[in-house]
A protein has these predicted regions:
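Active-site-adjacent mobile loop/cap segments within catalytic or ligand-binding domains
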Residues: 182, 200, 229-287
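A short, glycine/acidic-enriched catalytic loop
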Residues: 116-129, 188-213
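SH3/SH3-like beta-barrel superfamily modules
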Residues: 51-87
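Active-site-adjacent substrate-binding region
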Residues: 206-229
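Intrinsically disordered, low-complexity Ser/Thr-rich linker and spacer segments
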Residues: 30-32, 36, 44-45, 86-103, ...
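Hydrophobic membrane-insertion alpha-helices, especially the h-region
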Residues: 10-28
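Active-site histidine-acidic residue metal-binding/catalytic motifs
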Residues: 92-169, 175, 189
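Solvent-exposed loop/turn segments at secondary-structure junctions
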Residues: 111-114, 159-163, 185-190, 204-207, ...
Length: 287
């Protein structure tokens, strides 16, 4: 009788312990993830500028923290590494690793809502074509192509809404973006006076390097590449991250607008931008 009572007590003590161990095991397994080197480079810190760590073709890690949309991982129970959270969630989205798949990019479609920006006027029926329409169309194309490369893309606006200037660079600062790029279309005092594309930077260093790298890709556009220039624009001036503003043609010049309005031109610009951003991120990536 006493032996039966003791066994019952023992089981009453062991059951909570076993349940706790099962819960710990389940939580641990839930936070474990397999990392494929072909898809993700593990780094020493939360960003693509940190040096990579040595890794096997396949690693098993446990998520132990998060910073700037990067997961902190414990690899093989001893080594600490970092990886972009958005890539860990779907490693099959991009076949192989590339610099853009580690990058956070803020895309700013200039103007919007009650702020229409510059305009092109068609004198035949006197309709007006607004800058805000074409900056958004271009921004969406660039965003789509960047996401296809695995990049984390944040848009300051994704519809025809008004967004004040000051919050736009704040989005880049808050997300620790690797790149901030703002799209606009230029305008001259008189119609048909100006033509061409210009890339502006405000800060020297990474921002100027970004301007040079992206602008170099515009040499084969149907509009003349006017090069890079210093520009005192709030969205790039009040920006803590690498930031540029691209004027992709004069909207009030008929020759330029005939390009600006076409899907072909927008697609060509988007391809050039993605190529330039990939090159910039490759140059910035920790070695």
């Amino acid at each position: 009788m006493q032996a039966t009572f003791n066994r019952r007590q023992l089981w009453l003590c062991l059951v909570p312990l076993l349940l706790a161990l099962c819960l710990i095991f389940a939580v641990t397994k839930q936070n474990q993830i397999t990392i494929h080197k072909s898809a993700i480079i593990l780094r020493q810190g939360p960003g693509l500028t940190y040096a990579p760590i040595k890794q096997s073709a396949t690693e098993t890690g446990q998520i132990i923290g998060q910073q700037n949309s990067w997961y902190k991982l414990r690899i093989d129970d001893h080594q600490v590494a970092w990886a972009p959270a958005w890539r860990l969630k779907d490693q099959t989205k991009v076949g192989t690793h590339n610099a853009l798949s580690e990058a956070t990019i803020v895309i700013d479609a200039g103007h919007g809502g009650s702020d229409s920006g510059a305009e092109y006027h068609d004198n035949s029926n006197n309709p007006k074509y607004m800058e805000k329409t074409y900056t958004l169309a271009l921004a969406k194309r660039v965003a789509s192509k960047l996401r296809a490369q695995g990049a984390r893309v944040i848009m300051t606006r994704d519809n025809d809404q008004y967004v004040a200037l000051k919050p736009r660079p704040k989005m880049a600062e808050k997300t620790k973006a690797d790149v901030f790029i703002s799209f606009h279309y230029d305008s001259s005092p008189q119609a048909n006076e100006g033509s061409g594309v210009t890339t502006y930077y405000y800060h020297r260093g990474p921002s100027k390097e970004l301007a040079q790298t992206v602008n170099h890709q515009f040499n084969h556009l149907p509009l003349k590449n006017l090069g890079i220039n210093f520009g005192d624009f709030l969205v790039i001036r009040d920006n803590t991250q690498p930031a540029i503003l691209c004027e992709m043609g004069y909207i009030n010049t008929k020759r330029d607008f005939q390009q600006i309005k076409t899907a072909r031109y927008q697609n060509q610009v988007a391809n050039d931008v993605v190529t330039g951003l990939n090159q910039f991120c490759q140059n910035r990536a920790g070695k």
